């Protein structure tokens, strides 16, 4: 998490922007002062969690960083979990003091979407594409490692040219553990060597290098 030194920014509350990325596994809250991230908080995404529970969790965490967000300057939400939209709408209104802006499929961002059905492109992928073009120019490829691993291509004209969706590394590993009765869960990390000399090492090598190969292979083909 990034915190802006020891100087409290509570007096500047109205200038602060709260951005919320609601993913399938985690929800990340970021606070921006202008174009600078001053603090962020990561919570697990839980369908049963209410706006009041989120508020009770978040406000003390932000307060510890010197941030009073009961009257934030704005709230922007990108979510891939539609059933939670009402929860974050209420959270923004009652705990951050403003009406939220939801980034949704079909939103006008100034970026041409070269997709058969532009409305199918998820909010997370739209945000990634626009941010990548803004930060790095184009052409550019964005790789997002989440529950799914997505590859999104912005072409030389600055247009969203399409993408690739692959299973995420965690759910890929879980599928292996679930369907292979004699294999057990291991930490997902780079193994000491490519060729495993025990079951744990062999599984780690397969997961790690298999996934590296997937990413490298797709990027090579995109180039």
Residues of each region from the PLM?
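Short, basic, low-complexity termini and linkers enriched in Ser/Thr/Gly/Pro
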Residues: 1-13
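Short glycine-rich, Thr/Ser-proximal phosphate-binding strand/loop in the N-terminal lobe
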Residues: 12-63, 158-184
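ATP-binding/phosphotransfer module of carbohydrate and carboxylate kinases, centering on a glycine-rich
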Residues: 14-19, 45, 49, 175-223
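Short glycine-aspartate micro-motif
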Residues: 17-21, 76, 140-144
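Glycine-rich phosphate-binding loops at beta-strand->alpha-helix junctions
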Residues: 26, 49, 78-85, 205
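Phosphate/pyrophosphate-binding loops at sites that engage ATP/ADP/AMP, CoA/4′-phosphopantetheine
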Residues: 58-74, 219-223
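Short glycine-rich phosphate-binding loop at a beta-alpha junction
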Residues: 69-80, 99-101
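Phosphate-binding/catalytic loop of phosphoryl-transfer enzymes
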Residues: 98-102, 107, 111-179, 209-223
